[in-house]
Design a protein with these regions (language model features):
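Conserved, structured C-terminal
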Residues: 2-27, 31-33, 83-320
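Acidic, proline/glycine-enriched N-terminal capping motif
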Residues: 1-70, 74-75
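Long, hydrophobic/aromatic-enriched structural stretches that serve as scaffold segments
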Residues: 72-88
Length: 320
């Protein structure tokens, strides 16, 4: 069985059970999948309120949210997890993907006289409908510190994904009955199936929140809080038709062959009108799967799937 086909089978097993992806970690800090900072003072809170599209003042102790970081043009430059740790009103952890973001954060922090802490920590992602901890089932949107034989692990759950952080040894040789150990492709596929493509692939295109179902990650409630990119984002969301995320699989044979020559997926109506493009493609079992952001009025079950550069079109199955 090829590695790609094996990834698809692993993703399918984890989708009906649970899976763990241990993220790459570079000791030099240059090629890690995630980077982490913490703030623990009033200046740090002000810094995050300027930087993030969610408002940390509305994240209570022990809660976690996801957020965009935008540039001045309103384009998404990163997608982050923001956890309000239980021990303090001003203690927040921010987990993001781009090393460029870290460099930019240092520049923005100077304006707030803020000296945040960069953490060296290992990260894993648990995919499961329910997250069991030594303290019982973990609620959605919550943070929990777990004490294990390999040190403390911080768990941050959003939907079917739980971000775990701890010492490197915490994830070494980790096994659990019924848990699939995921490779990168199977982990990405599960992100797409959970409608969270931005957890891995926000950098695939120049996107604005209005291009995706981005309203869930933006807090406009405080009119005086001018986060970077706010004005353009607010105007675009008001002017454009709301989008919904749909997970589709195509009725095409030999789906794994797509990965030999990846291309953008184009989704069309039955009349041949393009409604969306998607670069967020994975393999679930033997089915080529994608998540796309289409207008709310779209009948997803009638969409036609085309791979960029091909003339063949395929019917779709709506997974969610």
């Amino acid at each position: 069985m090829s590695d790609i086909r094996l990834s698809g089978q692993t993703a399918l097993k984890a989708h009906t059970g649970m899976g763990l992806y241990v993220c790459p970690n570079d000791d030099e800090g240059l090629n890690s999948l995630y980077y982490t900072i913490e703030v623990n003072d009033a200046q740090g809170v002000a810094f995050l309120r300027r930087l993030l599209t969610v408002d940390v003042k509305n994240i209570h102790r022990g809660e976690v949210r996801q957020s965009f970081i935008l540039n001045a043009l309103g384009l998404m430059t990163d997608f982050v997890w923001v956890a309000h740790l239980p021990d303090s009103d001003e203690h927040f952890r921010v987990v993001f993907q781009s090393l460029d973001t870290l460099a930019w954060m240092h520049q923005v922090a100077k304006a707030f006289d803020e000296d945040f802490t960069t953490l060296k920590t290992s990260t894993a992602i648990l995919f499961a409908d329910q997250t069991n901890t030594p303290h019982g089932l973990m609620a959605d949107g919550k943070v929990q510190v777990m004490k294990t034989s390999k040190g403390e692990v911080l768990a941050m759950r959003v939907g079917a994904m739980t971000l775990l952080q701890g010492e490197e040894k915490a994830f070494e040789n980790f096994t659990h009955p019924g848990m699939e150990m995921l490779d990168e492709l199977s982990a990405i596929t599960l992100c797409y199936v959970s409608k969270s493509p931005l957890a891995f692939a926000w950098q695939a295109n120049d996107l604005m929140p209005g291009d995706v179902n981005g309203a869930a990650y933006i807090d406009f409630s405080d009119s005086s809080r001018m986060f970077i990119g706010r004005a353009l984002t607010e105007a675009r969301l008001k002017a454009g038709e709301a989008k919904k995320a749909v997970v589709l699989s195509s009725h095409q044979d030999e789906a794994e062959a797509w990965f030999e020559n990846p291309s953008e997926v184009i989704l069309l109506t039955e009349e041949g009108v393009p409604v969306a493009k998607s670069a967020f493609v994975g393999l679930l079992g033997d089915k080529l799967t994608c998540v796309a952001f289409v207008p709310q009025s779209t009948d997803s079950s009638r969409l036609i799937w085309m791979n960029g550069g091909e003339e063949q079109a395929y019917r779709v199955e709506v997974l969610s």
